[in-house]
Amino acid sequence: MKFIEWLILKEGDASIINVQQVLQGKQPEWIQIVSRFPEMLQKEILEERPNPNQEDIQWISSWQLASKQPVAMNTTTLLQNKENLEAISRTPHDIIQEINKKWGLNVPAGKVYDPNPDRYQQYKQFQGSTAKPSVMVNGVIEFGVGRFIAALLRGDKQLIAWDIRSKK
């Protein structure tokens, strides 16, 4: 599959987000918070939270970048985090089974909330190097969970992510 086809399949495309347009008319506090981050991360935040509520504003205002660039995270380390395992449990049963088998896990199936559960099989067809960085806060993949699941399905040893620390 070609890269442009992949862009169309994605749940969103932060690369085409115009930061200034999206921020237009937003609360000054939100604009100030988002503007602290590199543009690529700003786009990811705005894709995930285009209309932030007060809880979003408080949460993201607490973020501190551990690195000015995305970093390569060891996938095995990410699998040691309970909340990342819970994210796996919210994927379709066949995806959970495939990940459990590949990684020697025993993640139980949970309720699937995903409006597009077929996307994981589509995403795994692409090389991890073509994916945007996920957003990891205190070791938990918060944004880009589909990219994380696809990396697990491919057996990727690393996932590229923004490494963020938060006190909340």
Residue positions per predicted region:
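General N-terminal targeting signals
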Residues: 89-90, 158-159, 165
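Amphipathic, charge-rich alpha-helical segments that serve as recognition/docking helices
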Residues: 11, 149, 161, 166-168
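Short active-site loop/helix that positions an aromatic residue
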Residues: 145-160
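N-terminal extension/subdomain marker
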Residues: 4-71
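Short alpha-helix boundary/capping and kink motifs at helix termini
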Residues: 20-28, 33-34, 40-41, 63-66, ...
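A local structural micro-motif
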Residues: 16, 53, 108, 159-162
